[in-house]
């Protein structure tokens, strides 16, 4: 029996940090070849704690971003979840030579209790765009972990999921340029709770 074919990969070096993503060839479903980077950690947070940005840094053996990471916990989750879920997924056209690309950030819906950043096929969104763009889907804490009750005036524990989203956008402003994106040209989009997240000013 022949050995299983290894997936094609793409590598980015950010200072001393090596990031290995998945290279996806063009197909009928995805007209452009794409590079996908799954599960990049943008922040860390203890339970009931505000998030802190996590810079890209070297790890033993580099960062394997070829496969999705477990999403944030939700009730009756159909798959493995993890509280280490302040992660984002990047999709870009392969070998774009048109300079820094606009970045579209997708925030998933689910009433702030359910959902997954990979619910929407953002790879198809990028592959079928007339102009070269990048997409980023963001994981943020949900339910009691992200929107649990706090004492009146307890700002430290309120709306932690929304704080996660803000940390993710600030992370992108700093780091997306290494992936070919324009940190000064970021558009937020979402559905349901994700659209609600986009609406507040600031």
Q: Which residues are covered by each model-predicted region?
A:
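Short glycine-enriched nucleophile-adjacent loop
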Residues: 195-202
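Extracytoplasmic/periplasmic beta-strand context in beta-sandwich domains
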Residues: 123, 184-186, 199
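Amphipathic alpha-helical interaction motifs in eukaryotic regulatory proteins
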Residues: 108, 126, 166-173, 177, ...
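Gly/Ala-rich beta-loop-alpha elbow adjacent to hydrolase catalytic centers
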Residues: 190, 194
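Short alpha-helical patches at coil-to-helix transitions and adjacent helical residues
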Residues: 85, 162-169, 195
């Amino acid at each position: 029996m022949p050995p299983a074919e290894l997936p094609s990969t793409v590598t980015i070096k950010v200072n001393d940090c090596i990031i290995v993503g998945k290279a996806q060839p063009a197909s009928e479903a995805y007209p452009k070849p794409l590079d996908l980077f799954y599960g990049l950690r943008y922040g860390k947070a203890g339970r009931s704690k505000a998030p802190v940005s996590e810079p890209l840094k070297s790890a033993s053996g580099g960062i394997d971003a070829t496969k999705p990471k477990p999403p944030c916990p939700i009730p009756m989750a159909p798959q493995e979840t993890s509280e280490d879920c302040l992660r984002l997924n990047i999709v870009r056209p392969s070998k774009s030579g048109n300079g820094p690309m606009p970045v579209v950030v997708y925030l998933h819906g689910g009433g702030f209790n359910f959902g997954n950043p990979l619910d929407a096929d953002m790879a198809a969104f990028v592959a079928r765009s007339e102009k070269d763009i990048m997409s980023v889907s963001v994981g943020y804490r949900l339910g009691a972990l992200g929107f649990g009750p706090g004492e009146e005036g307890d700002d430290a524990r309120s709306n932690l999921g929304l704080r996660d989203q803000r940390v993710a956008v600030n992370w992108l402003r700093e780091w997306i340029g290494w992936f070919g994106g324009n940190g000064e040209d970021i558009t937020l989009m979402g559905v349901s709770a994700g659209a609600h997240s986009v609406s507040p000013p600031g």
